[in-house]
Design a protein with these regions (language model features):
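Conserved phosphate/ATP/ADP-binding segment of small-molecule kinases
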Residues: 1-73
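Conserved post-catalytic alpha-helical subdomain immediately downstream of the catalytic base
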Residues: 46, 51-54, 79-142
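C-terminal catalytic "cap/lid" subdomain
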Residues: 60, 142-143
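Hydrophobic residues at beta-strand termini and immediately following loops
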Residues: 76
Length: 143
């Protein structure tokens, strides 16, 4: 699920819930200090458990991503990119995360691949498809 504020609480029991940091803050009525790097894991865990999500995946813009999936927590820093346009980045992230999850990837692999894909589409103007060969090359560089 890639939620918006209007229907933020409509997805109890979802396998993976993916707000960005702004959506999480607004949806939960929090201020920025509640979502600092130190406070984020506890906030995510509490919300994940209250909504009975298997996983909660937060995109953090220039800070990367944070994922709490089942019993594993993963923080992945952003990769340095020349950002042209963020349109479609969230859709790319949830699409890659869903595919990786369906393929049996670990939470760390899901977070890393989705983070890479979201960053790659931000290098182009407008909403663009992710180029699979480019994602594969970037992912190969992680080893």
């Amino acid at each position: 699920v890639d939620p918006k504020k209007k229907n933020f609480f409509a997805y109890q029991g979802a396998t993976l819930f993916k707000p960005n940091l702004h959506e999480l803050r607004d949806g939960l009525g929090l201020d920025s200090s509640d979502l600092s790097s130190l406070a984020l894991p506890a906030t995510v865990k509490k919300f994940k458990e209250s909504q009975n999500f298997e996983g909660l995946f937060v995109t953090l813009s220039e800070r990367g991503v944070y994922m709490d999936f089942r019993s594993e927590q993963v923080a992945i820093p952003a990769h340095i990119r020349q950002i042209a346009d963020v349109s479609g980045a969230g859709d790319t992230v949830i699409s890659i995360a869903a595919c990786a999850l369906a393929a049996g990837a670990s939470p760390a692999q899901i977070a890393e691949l989705a983070n890479l894909g979201g960053g790659l589409v931000c290098e182009s103007l407008g909403v663009v498809p992710i180029q699979a060969d480019l994602l594969k090359r970037e992912a190969a560089g992680l080893d």
